[in-house]
Structures are given as structure tokens and as C-alpha cells.
């Protein structure tokens, strides 16, 4: 794997993490993505209206509507940015299993040093009680030289840690 390609590193790790939980009987929830989609549609509506008004009636008529459409677009765009960066943040996976809710926030840290660690923060909700757990694993243990995740090693590492979440 290229030494400085943190985004490839993070996306491969997040995908493997999601696949692991899906294989182990967790039912994934897409609430964050659904809400983000609705907010994105709310951004498109004022822009589409502006385009339609200009196309049909011309820019002269559009000017009187812009004072309403631009603030709507701006607010929807700000809400989308807030939702994506603050509310959803780095959450990779939200799922339930046997009345347990698990929210996985994966903050990947890849410092430029010889032995970087990947750290994943888990929030497990059960009976309205939240438990914070953190899992760190050396990158060299789960990634091979060519940049692919060693599935067997990844499964072994996370299975050791998963017993804490399951109990």
C-alpha cells in the first residue's frame, strides 16, 4: 500500500469492518444516509426551481425569486454540511443485534512513524446505557505488503475484541 494513501487505507479497513459485522448477524441501519439524502434533496429543490424559472420566464423574473431561493439553498447546504461533519461525523456503521444497538465510529490515525496503529471507537448501546470501547491494532498486523487486508488476520484480531461487545 502506498505509504501516504490514508484514504485508501481507511476505506479498505472500514469496508472490511462493515463486512465483518454484517457476516456476524448484525442488521445495518441506514438512518444517517437516509437523512443525508433528504437534506441533499432539500438543497436541490431551490436550485431546480431557480433553473426552471429562468428557463421558462428568463432572468428578469428570476431576480425577484432569488431573494427567497438563495437563503433556502444556503440553509439547506449548511444543514447538509453540519449533518455530514458533526452529526454523522466519522460513523462507519450503525446496526442492531438481539436488542443491542452498536454504533461504530472509526477514526483512523496513521501517523508518519514506523509502527502506526489504527484505532476504532465503538459505542455500544444496551438498555439506554452507552459503553465506549476502543480497539487499536498495528497496521502491519492486518495489512499485507501489497496493501490488501489479510482477512484471516483481521477476523482473528476483531474476533478477540468482539467478545467484549457481544457480552
Swiss-Prot record:
Xref: InterPro entries? Spc2/SPCS2
> Cellular component per GO?
endoplasmic reticulum; signal peptidase complex
| Keywords attached to this entry | Endoplasmic reticulum, Membrane, Transmembrane, Transmembrane helix
Which residues face the membrane's Lumenal side?
Answer: 58-68
Q: Which GO terms describe its biological process?
A: protein targeting to ER; signal peptide processing
Positions on the Cytoplasmic side per record topology: 1-36, 90-167
Residues of the signal sequence? none
| Record membrane topology | Multi-pass membrane protein
Tell me the compartments it is located in.
Answer: Endoplasmic reticulum membrane
Question: Where does the UniProt entry say this protein principally localizes?
Answer: endoplasmic reticulum
Which residues span the membrane?
A: 37-57, 69-89
The protein's assembly and partners: Component of the signal peptidase complex (SPC) composed of a catalytic subunit sec11 and three accessory subunits spc1, spc2 and spc3. The complex induces a local thinning of the ER membrane which is used to measure the length of the signal peptide (SP) h-region of protein substrates. This ensures the selectivity of the complex towards h-regions shorter than 18-20 amino acids. SPC associates with the translocon complex.
The family assignment reads: Belongs to the SPCS2 family.
The role this protein plays is:
Component of the signal peptidase complex (SPC) which catalyzes the cleavage of N-terminal signal sequences from nascent proteins as they are translocated into the lumen of the endoplasmic reticulum. Enhances the enzymatic activity of SPC and facilitates the interactions between different components of the translocation site.
PANTHER family from the entry? MICROSOMAL SIGNAL PEPTIDASE 25 KDA SUBUNIT, SIGNAL PEPTIDASE COMPLEX SUBUNIT 2
Its recorded name reads: Signal peptidase complex subunit 2
- State the species of origin: Schizosaccharomyces pombe (strain 972 / ATCC 24843)
Please state the gene responsible for encoding this protein.
spc2
